[in-house]
A protein has these predicted regions:
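Active-site glycine- and acidic-residue-rich loops that bind
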Residues: 170-175, 232-246
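Conserved strand-turn element in the central/C-terminal portion of the radical SAM core barrel
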Residues: 141-145, 216-240, 259-274, 295-306
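N-terminal pre-triad scaffold of radical SAM enzymes
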Residues: 64-105, 112-136
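Mobile, glycine- and charge-enriched loop segments
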Residues: 77-84, 91-93, 97-106, 153-160, ...
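Auxiliary Fe-S-binding modules of radical SAM enzymes
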Residues: 4, 8, 12-17, 23-58, ...
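Core AdoMet radical
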Residues: 104-123, 127-220, 225-230, 255-260
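Conserved, mostly hydrophobic/aromatic
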Residues: 43, 67, 96, 192, ...
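Short, electropositive alpha-helical surface patch
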Residues: 149-156, 185-191, 239-255, 309-324
Length: 357
């Protein structure tokens, strides 16, 4: 499969581009970002064969403006808001270097087993009353199995019966049968981040592989669920790694792409990494939009690094956001303030279930 190819990110010279038959607009960077945005609106798609270094050298303001035009054309003004509940916390056996919930790291992460169903359903109903589009149960661990998985299925069945909000799950490496059972219980989206590029993945985690991530996402797509997958930037990766991640997600046909900016957590191996600048985050969001024009580009952790909790990102290609409580990083924006901010930008924050009422 094409997404298994290990990419050589030695960027093409203009002569190599000319000889390879790649569109001449890439030669010597004669195209600006706004022209490229129009080509994407007209049907062009960015691939690994293109000179991806363009996105690193073009004018940031033009890149963001072009990304916003692409967003407006393909996604429109609707902003998809999702909220999550940490259904099971801590003691994760995986060694992800960024994560407070890994048992390999030394953090003050709260530890508890799967939450009572009434706690989850109450949170779901609260989010529905506030106008959030979808609600997700997220659990720590390699995969949710056994009695706890059965509890999750029952909780989703209850929420599907009593609520109209869309339902999502993030429960690790589930098999086909488990994904099917969640789907039957009312879950229509499944989240499973690839985290970074194939090249960089072993620097971030060694207890599972990039290929296992890809296989899980293929199962999600085969089940007919929406696939939500993105990653974290600021973990010591290169710009080429970020571009690779964006292209890999496009090749997989991912529907929703959360972009997290690392908020270093004390007690993790990445605790001393510098925080990203706003310009770095915006450039990343923007080129993810160019490369994934049909996907929801979703703001996730790290919004505190952006002006006004990310308002500028919604003018740079973002079309969705996690809102409210955000697991183990500080949540700087509440649901109501997010909705007010987006309404002030003339964005549509009315969930479908309110429109249907």
């Amino acid at each position: 499969m094409i997404w298994y190819t290990i990419v050589n990110f030695k960027m093409k010279t203009s002569l190599q581009i000319e000889n390879s038959g790649v569109s001449a607009v890439w030669k010597e960077k004669v195209m600006n970002a706004l022209d490229l945005a129009q080509e994407i609106i007209d049907g062009r798609r960015i691939t690994r064969e293109d000179d991806l270094s363009f996105f690193l050298t073009c004018d940031l303001k033009e890149l963001c403006e072009g990304a916003d035009r692409i967003r407006a054309h393909f996604i429109g003004e609707k902003v998809d808001l999702c909220s999550i509940i940490n259904g099971r916390s801590g003691r994760c056996p995986e060694d992800c270097k960024y994560c407070a919930q890994s048992a390999h790291n030394h953090t003050n992460c709260e530890v508890y087993d799967f939450l009572p169903e009434e706690t989850i359903v109450e949170a779901c109903k609260m989010n529905e009353s506030e106008g959030v589009d979808r609600f997700s149960i997220v659990t720590a661990g390699r995969a949710l199995n056994g009695e706890e998985f059965e509890k999750a299925v029952h909780a989703f069945e209850t929420m599907h019966r009593e609520c109209r909000i869309d339902l999502c799950a993030s429960m690790g490496f589930l098999n086909e049968e488990q994904l099917h059972r969640l789907h039957e219980a009312g879950v229509n989206s499944y989240h499973h981040n690839i985290e970074t590029s194939r090249r960089n993945f072993p620097n971030i985690c060694t207890t599972h592989t990039y290929d296992q991530k890809i296989e899980t996402l293929k199962k999600v797509k085969a089940e007919g669920m929406c696939a939500c997958s993105g990653g974290i930037i600021g973990m010591g990766e290169t710009w080429e790694d970020r571009l690779d991640m964006a292209v890999s997600l496009a090749e997989l046909g991912i529907d929703s792409i959360p972009i997290n900016a690392l908020m270093p957590i004390k007690g993790t191996p990445l605790e001393n990494l510098p925080q990203l600048t706003e310009d770095e985050i915006l450039r990343t969001i923007a080129f993810f939009r160019y490369i994934n024009p049909l996907a929801n580009i979703r703001l996730a952790a790290g919004r505190a690094l952006l002006t006004n909790d990310g308002e500028i990102a919604f003018r740079s290609g973002a079309s969705a956001s996690i809102t409210g409580n955000m697991l183990t990083t500080a949540a700087c924006a509440t649901i109501r303030s997010d909705r007010e901010m987006l309404k002030s930008m003339n964005r549509d924050v009315t969930p479908d279930y309110w429109k249907e009422a």
